[in-house]
A protein has these predicted regions:
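Structured, non-membrane catalytic/scaffold regions adjacent to prosthetic-group chemistry
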Residues: 2-206
Length: 206
């Protein structure tokens, strides 16, 4: 993964629309747009070169190409997302395949407790397995009814909306199930190992 940090598109408002005040976690402000934050260059992955693999502590390592991924059952998330840089986007939606659906095919082994997500380009982030199951996470390929743009992780990204958004790895290509927690890029660089916005778990020690 190349160095550098890219961000753009901040149009934040400190106060959310009326009736949405309780949806902002502590320390967050309302953002009407969808800012772009990226470590390194924006990846360009054509759908005919895209793959997603689930491996590690599973009974069956499974890999999908774009066509086989598109054939899986799909669901939609409607709700909010929260970035560790303190913006929150309220009332948005993404569609894709739930992680539950992927794991149903891979069959996690009993000792699997954590997942390391790997992106095209080498970015990694760690997530407790419990934060990816029971309808809490997706591999999403559309946003607001349109194909997910490259700058937001298209053709597909991990979506874990109840955690800070760096856990929702852009351009995801692999989910590896592990018995022990293995920190990813930002976690090795001082960010919290879990990242719950309602507990303000931004940095190590929070």
């Amino acid at each position: 993964m190349s160095g550098g940090f890219i961000s753009r598109g901040f149009f934040g408002k400190r106060r959310p629309p009326e009736g949405m005040e309780g949806r902002l976690p502590p320390g967050q402000y309302y953002e009407s747009g969808f800012p772009v934050l990226t470590v390194g260059p924006t990846e360009k992955i054509e759908t005919d070169a895209w793959t997603l693999r689930v491996d590690g502590l599973v009974e069956h390592a499974v890999e999908w190409n774009w066509n086989s991924f598109q054939a899986l059952p799909r669901t939609t998330y409607e709700g909010d997302i929260h970035c560790v840089t303190k913006w929150s986007k309220l009332g948005t939606n993404f569609s894709g395949v739930s992680v539950d659906e992927l794991l149903k095919l891979a069959q996690p082994q009993p000792e699997a407790k954590y997942v390391l997500a790997t992106s095209f380009g080498g970015y990694t982030t760690n997530v407790p397995l419990a934060d990816l199951v029971d309808g809490k996470a997706w591999v999403a390929d559309t946003h607001e009814g349109q194909p997910l743009p490259r700058e937001h992780g298209g053709p597909a990204r991990l979506l874990v909306p109840h955690l800070y958004f760096w856990k929702s790895a852009k351009w995801v290509t692999k989910l590896t199930l592990l018995a022990e927690d293995e920190w990813g890029f930002w976690e090795r660089n001082g960010y919290h190992h879990r990242g719950d916005p309602w507990k303000e778990q931004r940095y190590t020690g929070d």
